[in-house]
Amino acid sequence: MFFHVYGENSFYQFLGFILVFIGLILTNEFARYSPTTGFISFLGIPILITIYLFFVNICGELGYKWAENNSTYIRMNGWFHYAKLYAADIGSLGFVLIKYKIWIGKYDWFKVWPFVIVAINILIAVVSDFESAVKGARNLDIKGDRWWLSSEGIWLYGGWWNVLNGIAGIINIFCMTDWWGIYSSKDKKDMLWPDMTWQFIVAYDIWNFEYTYCNLTTHSWYCGLALLLAPTFANQFWNKGGWIQNRANTLSIWCMFAQLFPEFLDNSIFSVVPSLYKRYENKLVKDYEKPTAADPTSQGIIAILSIVSNIWVICTIFKRWIERKRNPYTNPIFNDTDDYMDAYKRIGQGDTEEIIKNEPSPQIDDLNI
């Protein structure tokens, strides 16, 4: 229903999905292992990649053939990919500082950094969603259909689903609660946000999947499914409370990979296109051919799920706000839930004493940690 995953390449398409999923989990485990691996992943490697990208783009603009024919220069030149790459990376780098209490990471005022950088990342996507909606509407008026060609040679189909999902993204920002409730785990491997429970994660995942499905169409099999499932899987089974760190780390790693190897996504046996492209056209991306037909049904369905799920979460937050008479953005609002308590049990001793002092609840008082 959502993707064209059949035919002679179906084995490789599913194999690619599994490899990306496992690869993201393993590289996230490497990144969270120690301060050294964290700085290697989000400072050392990004510096090297930045130098490479700088020379590729400069040489491409100067007309050097090797750069003009480079897949990164051709397929990853849009503002979104660069904004996302560096926004995700500085987010992960900030998380390393917080969990190890290095430099500004040891100050309480910096605890709001996770909220700030996640909000920025969401807004980047929201702007992109609205951009697609506007360009789709303009082309419908001028050319009679909603197709528009991105700077990276990908045909996108903008419509009301982008508007709906953009609104859902704005709501999602305010579904993040207890902005200063950020702590280190006992083993210092993880930055924990206990009040970011499954409700937010579900709403975020649906919203972000719809974003990738509408705007990163030829990449969404990987960055819309595998990339979202990897941090959620880790959070569910062994890294409770660390979802936002998992998400930032895997997103940073994925953006670096995609920026360097776009051919894996666009023109290989692993490439997958969504059902938006009504008929599977194997040369769709490679030859920049305008699709002959569109089926935006799935885009519309997921957009509705996105807005409904985010409205549901924000209503839950407001309901708890009224019942508890506590600001959900400066206080925990879900600290009576199992999700919160599972994360709380992983918090280091110094931070738990701070929570008991500032965030009293019967569940926390009953724990003997």
Set out the residue ranges of the language-model regions.
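Generic multipass alpha-helical transmembrane bundles of integral membrane proteins
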Residues: 105-241
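Membrane-helix interface "capping/anchor" motifs
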Residues: 29-39, 100-111, 236-249
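C-terminal transmembrane-bundle signature of multipass membrane proteins
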Residues: 13, 17-25, 223-365
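Juxtamembrane loop-transmembrane helix junctions in multi-pass integral membrane proteins
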Residues: 4-7, 72, 102-105, 152, ...
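Hydrophobic alpha-helical transmembrane segments and adjacent interfacial helices
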Residues: 25-29, 45-63, 91-102, 117-132, ...
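Alpha-helical transmembrane segments of polytopic membrane proteins
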Residues: 8-18, 41-49, 74-93, 108-125, ...
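An N-terminal, globular interaction/scaffold subdomain
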Residues: 2-103
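Membrane-interfacial helical/loop segments at transmembrane boundaries in membrane proteins
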Residues: 1-2, 62-77, 131-155, 268-293
